Amino acid sequence: MERHIDISRFDYDLPDERIAKFPLAERSASKLLVWRGGEIAEKRFADIGDVLPAGELLVFNNTKVIRARIVMHKLSGARIEVFCLEPHDPADYERAFAVTGGCTWSCIVGNRKKWKEGYVEINFERGGCAEHLRAWIVEDHGREFVVRFEWTAPMTFGQLLEYLGRIPIPPYLNRESEEIDNTRYQTVYSKFEGSVAAPTAGLHFTPELIGEMKARGFAFEEVTLHVGAGTFLPVKDEDAARHPMHTEHFEVRRATVARLLEKWGHITAVGTTSVRTLESLAALAWRIRTAGTPDAGRVVGQWELYDIPAEFSGREALQELSGYMEREGLDRLKASTQIMITPLDYEFRIVHNIVTNFHQPKSTLLLLVSAFVGDGWRRIYDYALGHGFRFLSYGDSSVLLRE
């Protein structure tokens, strides 16, 4: 099937002053735009419990942003920045952060022209001892490189990044990361290291707000999707259908699948990363239905979900997945996805409501919003621009209700 998406239809003027460069003093003090059946209202994020349907299940992405930027130097003194994207060997995230002595990662290299051979290093002191971290390029893939790290300190790679690395805030903030970003560019429920960008819809939640919502009967579950740098890649082709989606790794627990099935029809995804994770489950379930296995080692393709029969419902998908995990004795399922959710007749199977920030013009995230609300996305963004809403990662939020 030939697909075409004119990306110019998803453009709008976003003045730089409307991009939130820093977070508000209080997470839940942000504004909340409410879209309900074509009607727009304005609330505070702290009041989201008054907006969502009673008893709704909210699904968080509990990934944690790593300090992925490491500034190193050549022996000549040249400054080289190594941006760790995802583990290469060991490739498993948990093992990659627990390893000691050495590992390899897929990275972006800043000032590459000054690093043609040899190693770069950073010297540091730990526990009164002089230590060093060194890095070599072992594979050149153009934009990305496989980099070998070796270090002397008795530390895991996760501890090393925490000690030496810097938080990779979005490039459109046009500033260096600061101390405030170490805490505020993380959700309060972040647990598992692996992301190089935050699932920003969740930045508005506080422990107090979550506690209040639980007391009112709202339920919460978590999935893990490690957000890659590809989330910031603009759609450069005038036909967005030719845009190659980035791959992101995700994980879901059997208990979460069971809860999703129990609450099907009342599921609110907090953020586009939660949307992509939940919707990708339908592809794994269809593989089980048709081939007896989710084939989790094979990436969920960019258009795979569009080829699944419309009558295969989200409830059926969750039943298939739950049954398979129970039969196989799997407590959790790991997979990867390149799913691209667009207005090309995409059928949302798992997600019923979405909490999300305001996204960049001509972005795949804006296509996802359009897939959910149709042409109403422009009314939403016109309202937000006209009523003082702050945009992008540190900006305000919206809740999109299908009612």
Residue ranges of predicted features:
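Surface-exposed, charge/polar-rich loops and edge strands
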Residues: 1-403
